[in-house]
């Protein structure tokens, strides 16, 4: 089944899970699309089975809190940041609920975490105005970049370069093998800073970069030229909430939730809004991602919703 405007318009909530007592701050699908794992401000980690459509288990990180949870490439392991007493990144085995390793170094809260799509490397960005490069096999930081402001960062789909959005005004591209030489490209955005950048993602084909903000617009940028291709708006976000924007796996569509529980979908090429879907969420949709392998997506406030299309194209 191919994603089209009409298939996207047909998506409806198939299941809602109420496992959390506070907002879900992040979730991540496993690379095979079979599970999704969430982190919440209630200090819990919930693992869901996407095929059965049910929660499998719940773990807790009461002391440190849990945010920015990401699957690694090894089965049943995740990395996540703390949102309580320290700024160390933790590497957890879900199998026996034990920490494999800690990654200390940041002196302020970690606000971005991206796992390499190809190996055990990951990057983290912090309010201490640095991006750190790590390897899961070592607790020592493998590289450090000092920036002029708060960073958002992500690997490209090949795992060869990473992009850093700095100070909500420029995107810098680094070659992973020679990042210490500085960025090989810098794109300055000529825009009035009415809001902060809260996320940065590459499309799966590597051609586009999506910048999410805590305002009521997101930007789609050409990853090679740094040109803004589209600015998408017209969704509700009056309280400057961090709303996650995402690409569909075919790189063709862009989705974002809103504070009123609706999901807005645009065609990336034409820039036209193709759908507004009502998730009937009780709060702002802080997390939204399409499953990498199956025709389903998930959205979350303090509840988690799984969506399915209602037509067969």
From Swiss-Prot:
Major localization class: nucleus
Start and stop residues of the WD repeats: 19-58, 105-144, 146-184, 192-231, 236-276, 280-313
UniProtKB keywords: Chromosome, Cytoplasm, Nucleus, Repeat, Transcription, Transcription regulation, Transcription termination, WD repeat
Subcellular location: Nucleus; Chromosome; Cytoplasm
SUPFAM superfamilies: WD40 repeat-like
Biological-process GO terms, alphabetical: DNA-templated transcription termination; gene expression; lncRNA catabolic process; negative regulation of DNA-templated transcription, elongation; negative regulation of lncRNA transcription; nuclear RNA surveillance; positive regulation of transcription elongation by RNA polymerase II; RNA polymerase II promoter clearance
Record InterPro entries: G-protein_beta_WD-40_rep (IPR020472), Swd2/WDR82 (IPR037867), WD40/YVTN_repeat-like_dom_sf (IPR015943), WD40_repeat_dom_sf (IPR036322), WD40_rpt (IPR001680)
Cellular compartments per GO CC: chromatin; chromosome, telomeric region; nucleolus; nucleus; PTW/PP1 phosphatase complex; Set1C/COMPASS complex
Phenotype seen when the gene is deleted: Embryonic lethality after embryo transplantation.
Assembly: Component of the SET1/COMPASS complex, at least composed of the catalytic subunit (SETD1A or SETD1B), WDR5, WDR82, RBBP5, ASH2L/ASH2, CXXC1/CFP1, HCFC1 and DPY30. Component of the PNUTS-PP1 phosphatase complex, composed of PPP1R10/PNUTS, TOX4, WDR82, and PPP1CA or PPP1CB or PPP1CC. Associated with multiple protein complexes including an RNA polymerase II complex, MLL3/MLL4 complex and a chaperonin-containing TCP1 complex. Interacts with SETD1B (via N-terminal region); the interaction is direct. Interacts with SETD1A (via N-terminal region); the interaction is direct. Interacts with CUL4B.
Annotated function: Regulatory component of the SET1/COMPASS complex implicated in the tethering of this complex to transcriptional start sites of active genes. Facilitates histone H3 'Lys-4' methylation (H3K4me) via recruitment of the SETD1A or SETD1B to the 'Ser-5' phosphorylated C-terminal domain (CTD) of RNA polymerase II large subunit (POLR2A). Component of the PNUTS-PP1 protein phosphatase complex, a protein phosphatase 1 (PP1) complex that promotes RNA polymerase II transcription pause-release, allowing transcription elongation.
Name of the molecule in the record: WD repeat-containing protein 82
Organism: Mus musculus
The encoding gene: Wdr82
């Amino acid at each position: 089944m191919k994603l089209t405007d009409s298939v996207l318009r047909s998506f409806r909530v198939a299941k809602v899970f109420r496992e959390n007592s506070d907002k879900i701050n992040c979730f991540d699908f496993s690379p095979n699309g079979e599970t999704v794992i969430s982190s919440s401000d209630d200090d819990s980690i919930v693992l869901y089975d996407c095929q059965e459509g049910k929660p499998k288990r719940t773990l807790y990180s009461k002391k440190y809190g849990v945010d920015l949870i990401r699957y690694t490439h090894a089965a049943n392991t995740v990395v996540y940041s703390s949102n309580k007493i320290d700024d160390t990144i933790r590497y957890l085995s879900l199998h026996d609920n034990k920490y494999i390793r800690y990654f200390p170094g940041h002196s302020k809260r970690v606000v971005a975490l991206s796992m390499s799509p190809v190996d055990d490397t990951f990057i983290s960005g912090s309010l201490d105005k640095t991006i750190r490069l790590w390897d899961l096999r070592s607790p020592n930081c493998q590289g450090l970049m000092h920036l002029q402001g708060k960073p958002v960062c992500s690997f490209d789909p090949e795992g060869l370069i990473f992009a850093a959005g700095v100070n909500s005004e420029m995107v810098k591209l680094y070659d992973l093998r020679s990042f210490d030489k500085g960025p090989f490209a810098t794109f300055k955005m000529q825009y009035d800073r009415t809001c902060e950048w809260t996320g940065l993602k590459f499309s799966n084909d590597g051609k586009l970069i999506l910048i999410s903000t805590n305002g009521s617009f997101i930007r789609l940028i050409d990853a090679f030229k740094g040109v803004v291709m589209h600015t998408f708006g017209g969704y509700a976000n009056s309280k400057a909430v961090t709303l996650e924007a995402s690409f569909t796996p075919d790189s063709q569509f862009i989705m974002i939730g809103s504070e009123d529980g609706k999901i807005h979908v645009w065609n990336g090429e034409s820039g036209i809004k193709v759908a507004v879907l009502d998730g009937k969420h009780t709060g702002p949709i802080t997390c939204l991602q399409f499953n990498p392998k199956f025709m389903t997506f998930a959205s979350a406030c303090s509840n988690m919703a799984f969506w399915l299309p209602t037509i067969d194209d």
